[in-house]
Structures are given as C-alpha cells and as structure tokens.
Amino acid sequence: MCWKVEIVVYCKRQKPQTRGTQYVPGERNKLNEDHGRRQSSSLANGMDNSHPICSSGEKRSHHWRSYKLIIDPALKKGSHKVYRYDGHQFSTPSFGMSPVDIVRDPRIGRLWTKYKETDLPVPKFKIDECYVGRVPPKEVTFAKLNDNVREGFLTDMCKKFGDIEEVEILYNPKNKKHLGIAKVVFETVKAAKDAVQNLHNTSVMGNIIHVELDPKGENRQRYFQRLINGSYTPLTLPVGGEEACDVSPRSLAEALMACEPSRRLFEGGSSVVAGTTPSGTNTPMSLDTAYSSLRQDTPQSQGTPHTPRPSGTPFSQDSSYSSRQGTPAFQANRAESSGGYKSRRHETKFQDAYNRRPERRYVHGPTQRGNTEQPPSFKQHQPPEPPSPAFTHTPPPPTSANFKTAYSQYQPPIPQEYTVASYHQPVQRELDYRRPPQAPPPPSTDFLPVRDRPTTPPIPEPPPAPETQPTTPPSSTPEPCPSPTQESERNSLDSRIEMLLKPFLNERGDSDAEVRMDGSPISSSSSQLSPIPPQRPSRPSSTGLEDISPTPLPDSEDDEPIRGTASLLANSRGMSPTNMHSKSCVGEPRTAIDKMDTGHQSSGEDMEISDDEMPGTPIASGDCDKNIVVNSALSLIQTIPMPPPGFPPLPHAAGFPLPPHHLPHHSTVSHLPSHHPMLHPLHSYGMMHFLPVDLLSSLPQLLQMPFQMQTQMLSRMAQSQHPYAYPYPAPSANPAAMPFGGPYPPLSVVSAPADTLHGQPWPLPSMPQFNPAVPPPGYEPQKEDPHKATIDGVLMAIVKELKAIMKKDLNRKMVEVVAFRKFDEWWDKQELSAKATLTPVKTGEGKDEEKERAKPKETMSSHLPWNKGEGLGFEGMGLGIGLRGIRLPSFKVKRKQPPEPTSTSDNKRVRPSTPVDDELEDEESERMGRTDGSRVDPAGSSSKRRPARPLELDSEGEEEEETSGKEESSLSDHEEEPVDDASERLSSGKDLEEEDEKKSESHSSESESSDSSDDEASSSSSSKSGSDSSGSESSSDYESSSEEEEEEEEEEERIVGMDDEEDVDARTSTSSSTTSTSSSDEEEVVEVKAPSTPTGPPPEEEPNELGRLEAVDEAEIDHKPSMVSLIKTKVEEVRPPSPKGLPADELDVDLEVKIPVPKTEASLEEVGNLRPPTPTGSFADSDQDTRPKIPTEDFPRTPGHEGPVPLESETTVPRSLPTPSMHLPLPPSHVPDPQSLLPPPETLPDMPVRGRLPTEEDIPRTPGRDLMDRARGLGKLQSTDTVPVTPGSDTPLTGNSLSSPHILGSPFSYPAQSPVLSAGIPRTPGRDLTFAPAFPDSAGLSAGLPIHRKASSEILEEKPLFKEPLLSASPQASLPNNAASSPFPGPPLPTASLPEPALPPQGSPPASIENSFPASPKELPVPMIDVPVPLDDTPSKKKLVRSKNKKGIQDSEEPQVTLIEASSLPELPVNNQYPDLPSESIKEEDGEPAFSEKEESQVPTIIPKVEETSFYVEEPIQKTRRQRRGWQELLLSMHSPVASPRRPSFMPRSDFEEMTILYDIWNDGIDEEDIRYLKITYDKMLQQDNAHDWLNDTLWVHHPPTNMGSATGVKKKRKEDGIRDHVTGCARSEGYYKIDKKDKMKYLNSSRLQSEEPDVDTQGKSIPAQPQVSTRAGSERRSEQRRLLSSFSCDSDLLKFNQLKFRKKKIRFCRSHIHDWGLFAMEPIAADEMVIEYVGQNIRQVIADMREKRYEDEGIGSSYMFRVDHDTIIDATKCGNFARFINHSCNPNCYAKVITVESQKKIVIYSRQPINVNEEITYDYKFPIEDEKIPCLCGAENCRGTLN
C-alpha cells in the first residue's frame, strides 16, 4: 500500500509536468503522447528530490517528499487521479483510504530471504613435481583388477577404509580397454595404508589384485606405460616384487629413462644435501631402520617421498640411490640392465630414498645441492662432519622436500646434476660411509658392501683446495655420523652385527615386503638390475655388481631388498683389505645405520646383484630374464681387482660414481664413493670430473637411465678405463693427512652441487676429508656376513626350484602342444577318411598326405622355445619372459572348410588349426622347416617348407602371422606355399612392415639362431623371435593390445576368408597336411605373417638355407615353379641384401636363377634349387633367418606398403619377381614384340605384389586364393605367371597406373582387387574381377584380373595360381611379364619359374600365359604390364589390406590394378637379365628408366604420362583383355572343378562410345567413381613429373559427385542391391512393410553377402553373439583365454552357483530401452551375487558354425551363442532361459564368468554392484575388436560406441 521513497526513486520522473496534483484527463493524453502513450510511473509516483516535481517551474509549495498515484483514471474509468503524499496525505482530502502507518520496503521480501549457496570449490592441495617434502602416501595404486571393476565398485570397496578424494580407473587411450589399473587417493594416510593392508593380494571379482601405496603414482604410470607398450597384459603385468624381475628391459629402461635418472640425480643430490639428515640426526641404524621401516610404510617413494623418513635418510634405497646417483654414468651402462631393473628403481625413487637418507648428505656433492640452499652451513659443517649432519639433519625433512625441490632446482642442470649426482652419489655413499667413520664401529659387512661396492677405492682427483676443509679427519667427525654414542652403538660389533642382521632380516622381511611393494623381490632389484655376471661368481661380485648396479633397489624395497645382502655383498665383494678397510672405515662410521644403509644401499645395489641373485644365478635368469641384463658394470667391477686394503674399496656402489681413481682423468667416474663419507663427497665431485670425456658426452643419455644403471655404466666405464686409475691413499694414510685432493677431491656440499652442475671438478670440500685408506676411528674390519652362505644357498635352491618349475611347465606346455598337434593330425585324418566318401579326394589331397608323411616329425626340442636359448637362459626362455615365450595350446578348433565349389583340388575341408596351435605348429613347423628345409613334398607340390619366418612380427604381425599361419596352415602344403605366399603377400604388407620393425630383433635372434643348425635356427629364431615377439605375442596372445587383436583377428579373418576362398583342394590338402602343414604351414604361416621385406637373414644361416634350397628336389621344383621362385627368393634372401639399387647379382649370393626368361625346364631346374619366391617376392617370404637382414632403407618402400621393396639393379631378378605369388605369365622369350612383353624394369625391384587386396578379406574365400591354390599346382609350374605381391603395397598395381585398378579413379579398377569382389562369394578369377567401369573399357579391364588357371584341371587342382588374383593375374598372360603381376614392372620371372606344364595344353610357351591361352593374333593384345599404382591412400597400411570390406566395394584402400597395354605404357628399361625383353619396351616416355630408386619408392612414378592416354588405350587393351579373359576364363572354367559362370564379356566400345562416355559428364555429371579415377590420374601425373607445367598450377579441389543417377539412368534394383525403392520415394511416408528375409540378411549381424558357396570357415564368427563373419579367431581365442584364466579361481563362484540353485533371483524380461528385449531384476540383488546362469544347448564349434549360418538364413539376426571355451559354445537361440535377453552395456551391472560345476562348464552372470528392482541387468559382451563395428546402444556415460 504505502510506497515510500524507495519506490519513488524508481519512479522518479525526470520531467514531471505537475507537482503531483491530479492531472486532468487531457493531460493524461498529453502525457501519453509525450511518453509514447506510456504512463510514466514518474508521473504517477514521484519523489521530491529537492527540485520541483513539475516542469512548469511552479513554486513548490508542498512539504512532502514523495507521492504515489493511488487511483489512476487510466485504469479506473471516471475517476480522478488520487495521489498520496508521503504515505499520509491524499490529493483528495476526503479520500477514504487510511494513511500508511508503517513504512516498509515494498519489494517482495521472499526474494531476499532466499539465498543461493555459493559453493566455491576449495582447491585440493595438489602435490606436483614442485612439491618439496615427503609426499604423504595417500595415493594407492591398484593393479591386476578385473576389467569389470569400475569406479563405483572401486569406490565402494575403498570407502570403508576412509574418505576418498579421487578414484580413477585407467583405460587404454587407444581402444578404451580396461587396463586393470586404478588410482585411489584417500583423504588420510591411514586410510590408504589400511586399504593397502586389507586389499592387497585379495581376490576381487576373481582376480588377485595388487594394491600398493604409490604416493606420486610413479608405479602406476610405469604399469600404465608397460601395458600401453604392449609389453605386458593386465594379468601378466609385473607388480610389486615381481616388478623387479619382470620389468622388461625396454619398458623399464623407458620408464627409468623417462627422466628419472636425471631427476634422481637432481633429487638425490639436492636431497642428499638438504634433505639427508646427518646420520647423527638419527643413529645411522635408526636411519637405515627408519628407512627400512619407511620403506615398509610406503612401498616406495620412488621419487616421491612416501612417508617422511624419520631419519631423513630416504631409504636404504637412498643408499642404493646414492649408488644409483653415485654413478649415473655407470648407470648408463646399467641402462641396458636397467631394462632389467624394475622401474621401481627409478631414479626418482632412488633419489628420494637417497635424499631422505641422512647418510646421503655425507655422500653427496649433490647433497651440496640441497646444501646449495644451505651450502654455507653445510660447508661449514662439512669440515666438522657432525655439523654437516646437523645441517643435513635439518635438511632431512627437506630431504624429501629438498629432493624434490632440489630436484626441480636441479632439473635444468640435469646433466650437470647428473654429474653432481654422480658426485653426490658417491658422496651419498660416502655419507653413509662417513657415518660409519663417525664411529669406527666394526663395519658391518652388510652395510660395508654397499659402500664397498666400489671394490677399487676411488681416488678422486685431488679436489680443489676445498678438499682441505674436509681434510678434517672424517673419523673424528664423520659428517653426519650419528652421535658418537650412536656410533658407538653402531660401532659396537654386537650392535652393528645386530643392526646388520636386523636390516638383513628386516630387509629380508621388511625389505622384501618393501621390495615386493616396490614390486620387486628382494633380490629382484639386484637380479633385475643385473644378473650377477658369471665373473662375479661370489657375493663380492654381486657386491661389485651392487656397486655398479646403477639402480639401487627401489627406494623402499629395492633399496636394499636384503640389508644383510648388502653386507654379504660387501663382504664377499670386497673383503679385500681395501674393501674391508673401506668397509670398516665406512662401515664403522656407518655403524649399523650405515650398515643398514649399506644394506639398503647394497641391497639396493646388492639387491641388484643381490645375494639373492647369486653371481652365478642371474635371478634365475628367469626372474629378470629379459629384464635382467647382466651388469657389465658388475662384470667390470668383478674383474676389477679389489683395491689394496689401504685404498678405499670401490665403495661406490652401483649407485656410487666410481671414484676418480678409475677415471681420474675422466671426470666420468667422479670417484668411487669411498666408504669414508669425506672421501665420498670428493668422489662425487670427482665423479663427473672423472667421468671419461665420452662418458660425459653421454651423460645426458646416462641421465636418462636409472641411477643404478647410470652408476653401473659409469663405474663400468670408469673401471674398465682405469680400474684403479686414481691412486689410493695409503691405507695407513691419515684421513686428515690425506687431503681430499689426494684420494678424493673434497666435496663442499654447498659448492658441490653447483660445481657439479657446472662441471667444476671439485666443489669446495664441505665435508671433512677422510683418508679413504685410513679406517675411521673405531673401525673394525667387517666380517663376512654369517648369513651370506645361507642366503646364497637359499637363493640357489630357489633358483634351482624356479628353473625346475619353469622347465616342468615348459615341458608340459610342449607336451600339450605336441598332443594338440597329434590330436589335430588324428582329427584331420579322421575327417579326411570320413569325408573321403563324401567328397572326392583330389590328387592334391594325396599329395598332402604324402607331404604329411614326408614331413619329419618335429622333435620336442624343436618345440621348446628355449631349444635355442640356453636352458632358461636369458636369451632362450627367461623367467622374465615367463610363459610369454611359450605359446599356450590354442583352444581354437581347427575347422575344416567345406570344399569350395571353385576349388579344384582337395575337397577335404580343412579344419583351421587353432591360431595358437597353429602358432605352435608354425613355430615347430618353422623349426622343422628349417631342419627339413630340404625336404620337399613328395607330391611335388611346392615344397611345404616355406622359409621358416622367425616370429618377428610385433604383436600385430605375430598375430597376423599366427592367423595367417593358422589359416594358411589349413591350406594344403603346396597350396600352402602359394597360399602362404599369398597370405604372406597379404600379411606381407602388414607383416613386412612389422617384420621390418621386428626384423632387427628377429634378425638378431635369427642371426643367432642362424649360426646354429637350421633346426636350432628355426627353433631359436622362433624361440628368440618368439621370445622377442612372443613376449609380446604371448602377452599379446590373448591379451595383446586390442589393435593386435584386431589385426590378428582381421588377419585371421582374412585368412579364414582366404582359406574359404582358397580352393577346396587347398582345404583338402590342408586338412591332410593340416597337421603337417600346420607345422609347416604354421612355420610358413608364421613366416607368412612375418613377411616384411625381409632383411637378409643372418648370413650365417644362408649357407644352410642355400643348402636346404638346393636340397629341394629339382623335380619337385619343376612341379612347383612357385617353389622354385620361392627358392630363388630364398636364395636371394639368403644372399646378403644388395646395396640399394645394386643388382641382385652384386649380392654376394648369386641367384642361379637370374634367368631372364628361361623357357626351358633346365632353367626351371636351376630355379628349382632355389626356394620358390615368396609371394611377396621379397625376402619376406624367405625365412627371416636365411634372409640377409636388409635394411628397409635398402629398398624403396612400395607406395602401397611401408614394407621396403628391395631395389635390385637389373642384374637381380626383382624379389618381387622371385616371388611368383601372382602367377603372371612371362612373355615367352620368343615373343616377337619385346615391347609387347614388357618386362618390368629390373629397376622395379621387387615391389612384391600384395598377396591380397582388402576386398579379399571381405570375401570368405578369395577366389584368387583358390586360384592361388590351384595355381600352386599350376602356378608352381607357372611361377613366373604369378605376380609377386609387393610386400609393402596393399595390392599390386598393374597396368598403367592410370588405368591400374589400384587407382581408385581408374576406370579399370577392379572393385575388388582380390578375386573376391563380393565379400561372401568366392568367384572364379575372371568373375572376381569386377571393375567399376569409369570408362567404357573398364569392363575389359576386368579380364585382366582373372587368375590364370592352368589348362589342365590337374594343375588347377594341384595349385591355385595365386591366392589373390593379382593384377590381371588371370589373363595376364597378356601381360608380357610377370611384370604384369608385379606391382612394378619387374624383370619377368624366369620362365623357369613357370613350369611349362603349368601352361595350358594349348601349350603356348610357358613364358606367358598369353601364349598358354591360344588367342587369335588380334587377341594377343599388346602385353600389358601391371604397374602397381599406389592409391592415394596407397600408404594405407597393412591394415588396409586387412580391412574387411565385406562388400567387395573398392575402397580407396583397395589398390586397384589396371592392365595397360605395354605399348601404352612408356617403355620401361628391361632388366638385363631378361634379354628377351627389350629394355626399351619398358622405358618411360621420357626415356628414363621407368623407375628410379626414388621412383621405385614411389610406385606411382612408374606410370608415365601414359595415364593420359590410358583412358583411350584401355579400350583396346580391355578388348584384348576381355578376349584373353574369355580364353582364360574358358580354360579356367573348363579346368576348374566347379566352374563359376563365365563372366560375361562385352565388346569393346568404339572410340565414339568412349568419347561419348568421356564427355557424358557434361550431360549427366560425374559420378564418384569417375572422380576417383580422375583424382588418381591427377595424382599419378603429378608424380610423373613429365613437365606438365599446367599440372603444377592445377590444384585438385574436391567436388561432390554431380551424377546422382538420372531418371533414365536409374537402373533396376536387383535383389542384391538392397532394400527396394520406396514407392513414394520417402521411407517416412511408406509406413511399414515386410522386408524380404534376403534383404534382411545383408543387415544381419553377419553382414556377409550370400555367396555361391557359403563361408565354410565361420570359425571366428560371432560365437559370443558376435554377428560378424569377421569375428577374429584371435581375439576370440584371447577372450577365451581370459575367461578361462579368470575362471581358475571360481570356488566362491561355485558356492554362489550352488546357492542359486536353492534360491533363484526373481527376474523378468520385457522391452528394454537398450535394445529389444532386456532382462530386469524383480528383486534387489546385492553385489557379487549370482544372478542367472546362461542356459542353452552345449554345442561344438562345428555345429555352432552350421547353426550360425542357418540362423542367418532364417533371418534370426541376433546371435545367442555364448562361447564357453575353445570347443564348447552355449546356444540359447532356440532353447535357453532369460539370460539370453541380457543386453550389453559399456557400464554393466553384471559380469559373466565361466565356472566349472561337476566337470561341466557353465556361464554364470554375477552382479557387479547392487541392482535395484526393475533395473535392467546388463553385462559387457566383450566382443573382440573388429573393423565392422556393431553400434552400442547402451547409452552409458562411458559408452564405447560399439560392441566390438
């Protein structure tokens, strides 16, 4: 009511017209007008602001201050305005309203009573790298978690221990895979510790989880890196104690090198200075003990202070650290080992530990860094060590802090720091030692060893004058030595022994625990660090190792896994008087604490060498296996004589820089830290100075290494350079008398850091100098650790046991493998016998059987991966490798594929061997093959023995290898070769790259193996490469990264497809030879997968290979031209790689087969001696071992593939040629027109033609592959016909690049290079070629692709020409040379390669298929050369090849090959080798060789301007091709057992028609295909550099296709075209109508096109409800294995299962928002309860495959098949329970588990979390990753988007 001033303020009008008296109505109107017909509130209500309200200027007579319009005539008709002034007076005196008595704010109070809580998040205190101080151990790292564990579950699990700040589960960034690692940050340290204590090693969801305190997440990061690198899988990830042994050298090295070394150095130095409290602060013992306890408290402060070390001593680790720091450079040497060392030894850790250690302060020059902050005091204190300790003590807390701060401070100067660190490290040790000097207590052997490690007393270069300061007898005031009392305690022999033992025991216990926490067993560190070199058979050696070992044990655990060990080490190590003396000096001062430190340190270092690791036993080599690298440093140290007693022992432990004495002139070894603290500082200074110049130059690298590694490196280097370069002060020398300048330059803690950083040789001595030779007061000679013998004995026993266990396990594995193989063989035989009646057995089958018989049985030894490796030696089978090297028996069922109608030979359906089995078989067969290299299939089919290819592939390659091997193993042996070739080709792209990558490894292993016998070589290579790759493989085998899985699966899938496509005979023979083949095939397969441009195998093996090759029967070779070519290839491969561009001839090994195009069998025979060229035509095919390692650089890379293509000069047959993988007819030498037969210029070295195009993958069976199989029979004869697959290229390009199908845009591109156009349907070679006719000729082009089939069906049956019809493979007879087949024109394969018999009966000279197919002269078109043209995406890697284009659509990825008449092609130089072919014919228009090396690298360049003309030329070419194709197809159809309908041939278009089509774009626009061709042509022309200036000025701008199909152009939809057109043209207006089941089939989960012959091999198909044909067997296998592994601990599950029987959960199914039907809980379900069993029919794989097809045919789109294991599948499609309705979710509330109940495996669904009523039950299907993605509809926040 009453509106007071406030309102008036709002309403105050600027120009009141009246004072506020009522306005007359007229005024109102005026006001309205004035104010825009807006009643101004100011008019109605106002306030007198000391100025008249009215503008009239009337005198204000009123006394009111405000007014309000009570009645407004505008609102109330007929009234006058009534105002109220000041709430009391009204303008109308007798107005009936009462005045306002209470004045209040008219605004609505509710608006103000409401308030929003401003919740400003309080930033959490974040501990980053700049944090100074011990990082509170509130962060817990979980490892080995079940992949069903999600944040919510983890939070619930941890919150009971205390409040949680953060929970994070780590996923693989690439594929979002659960890594089994998680981080939980608690609010309090207590909660974190409780969580670790209660959760560590407990079973969660069936997994024994690893839980550890990880304050800075370093361990977690390390685990993460290892998992990401593929080194480990979540289940094999080494954690805790395992870590030390298990860390792979690479991952560890990477982790260590990540910066930790430098950081450690920094941290170590600084922390030592600032952070280390004088040992005096705490009794050294207590410090050490604290260290150990601290270590126990916190797994490790690997670079992060975990729990403040009370002593300020970081950990005994710190000592280790010091040792680590001590000689970063040495560590560099260690670096190798560091790989072996667990990352826990990271510098950071060590540094932290080190820094924390009070002793460090003594030791460090680095401390000086810390001191830098307080350098003066430290210096001051230094002379009086105790003060220094005080200083140090103060720092100790900072130690952690300092260590970080210092670290950060010193980070920039890392290299210097490093130096400093080196100094520091020695100093640290020295500090430790110094402590002992405080009291001369008898040095405990334990601690002494650590410091003593430097057997040779480092004699630092005389430090600058500052030395003198330290000159103060250290003994008198051991720097930080604990107070004399403490010292005395320590010094007292009993107390010290007790201390030593305690640390020893503790270390054994605590240390172990700590170590385990760190993730490495006690000895692990040492063992990890380095297996004890044999030189150091004794502990002392380990001590030396210790000294050297760059990485001390983890701060906490690694530091000194065994305190006693340190002493033992020290004792054994250097009980030399010098050592003893140093030890005693050091040890005494150190006393127990030092001992402990020493122990720790030594344990860090010792641990590295660790008593545990007997010098003789490198941690069972298994522990560290790969990880362990023998410490050269140790070896050096071992070799290094112990310094004379007078001299300080080489106290520098691994962590300590060698005293300058070793490298006085080299700063590198600053100086072994003397045991005397004083000396150590000097050493630390000296370290950098002493490090050899080269070492200094390499410091940055060293810095990257773990400290221990650095230390070892430096010490090794220093020692090796001058073991005792620096003079040792006379033992008698007075410490005071001995200036630091003498033995050790004085270190001024303060100055040291700076100096070190700046490279000053010696900072001012901040620490008292002690004569290293003079024992500190109270020094008592250290006594050997009484427990050393016991420890050694125990270790030895343990190692023996481990070895025995490993051997037993491995033998069992091998036996299982053999048993599996035997079973497979038996199965194959049974299947063959059973099917013999059903399907005619082709001759090939018999051959296969013969081959099988011929195949020598593999010996068990061949199966043993360590067959080559020394027992369980590092190389052979390391424990580190664990079982990784061993292939688990594969669970995959080998299914025989039903004979393809097209397959001409064996009808037997091959049961694809399980990938794993195949891999095993492959390995074995590889070995066998190597051993039996000479053995040839009696049948005369191409020798089964493919060059065994070492398993070099990376996980991807391996898997591919495995898969291809597996799948291919299915192929008959002879088929196998071609198939292998093809698969090799296929995989060669990928594999080539992988091989190239891995080659170095595998070659190294190969070379090693090559030395040994073939068998050994094969086994060793397989075992080694196996261990190389198998490490990745095995780890990756089932869990390999999803990429691998994908690739492998893809590969397998592809292979499966290939197998399907392969002729049935391949299958048949495969089945018969599957066992033999599986072995040989697997070999081959492995090899095949491995193929990458082979770098030559080690020459050593070459002789064997050659011998083997020669051993091959010539007759056989005759039968197997492909083999001959393979042999050639092998020979070539055997030959050392020729220099780039050098002709093969130049290679050391001459290929007998340089045959230009020999027509005669003799040449064939010659070739026969050679291995058949691998399909890739590159060494890839040949055994890696035999293959000389050819640097990839040697060959330009095929544009399509990264695989290098060997550039061979004319003299050599391009490797591609050697590999007749594509059987292209060579032009008969007699061919009159050489040009017509354009041999690919030899310059086109081997661009191996890809074995298969991506489309092949799409097709279950590549018809081409079938042909390949037949061709094998034929092609072996016609090896020349086969076109080598360019290892690097996805597909071979043929024809003018312009027209080459590779060119996407090329009118002649065959939609699917691979014969298989439609993914599902095997096609006859001719049919396979479908080209998108961009140009009228395109139709003709298709003819070019068909694979030549031999005239004789026998031949066809025997061998498909090639796995994939390569470029115009079939009628390519037209191609003058195999050039047609080779992606690049290459010298034609010697006719010898082509068995004349292979030629069709028409008997044209085998030289060319053209000839083989009689054709009218006009029919003989100008020979066409298939020039591989890199697609734009040519670079598309192997993956492209593997990409599954189910639809046979040409993907840009698919290279398309077009055949161009040779005439159209610019002449390419012909190889001299092919005299028949005029080199002219192959010359570019420019006259330049078609390919220069550069050009070779760029396939595209090969095609000259021809592109421009190619469009036109293509027509005639196409005509001839068509005709030829007609012939060929006719022949093929005649010979093929099941002739697929001939591809219709069309008359070539006239020029007018061609032009009409060309210019039709103006009428109808241009379609996508033409755009693609144009783009390809454009790109090719750009690459040709034919002086088309206009091209350079032309920029390709993408434009959408304009030809969307005209009304007239609308073609009738065929049924297969897809869903019918909507009558109304719009689906929305159509409503619903029934879709034909056939139409639906396309969209069913298996989007497999209906093929004339259904895919026989559905092995990988959607078993776990996986819809796709492409389901990879590999990933299936891995997922199976994961399930099986997880089902091992299922006792509790059984209990739950049994409980379920009594009380089933109430659940119902109803419509789900996720997809169709879903399962919902009708009652609350608690976490981890059994929800339901997945019930269905238990069926075998074969039945599952059949049913899957049937279900697809019936239109059942969903798959309810759930795989239980490799041979059992539960099919709930038609009978089952509600479980089948459970939908997938990326954030499921349940998980599936396989449990065994009464010997029956059951799939049970368990709840992961509490499930509420009406909540849908979901679990993660965990489909293997595939290319064809199934969209995920779960809608979860973290939805992956796809099921697979």
Curated annotation (Swiss-Prot):
Q: Where is the composition biased (Acidic residues)?
A: 916-925, 953-962, 1008-1017, 1040-1064
- UniProt short sequence motif RxxxRR motif, positions renumbered to this chain: 1678-1683
In this chain, where does the modification Phosphoserine occur?
1138
Offer an example of a GO molecular function term for this protein: histone H3K4 methyltransferase activity
Q: What is its EC number?
A: 2.1.1.354
Would I find S-adenosyl-L-methionine among this entry's keywords? yes
Primary location class: nucleus
What's the family?
Belongs to the class V-like SAM-binding methyltransferase superfamily.
Would you tell me the protein name for this molecule? Histone-lysine N-methyltransferase SETD1B-A
Q: Which organism is it from?
A: Danio rerio
Organism lineage reads as: Eukaryota, Metazoa, Chordata, Craniata, Vertebrata
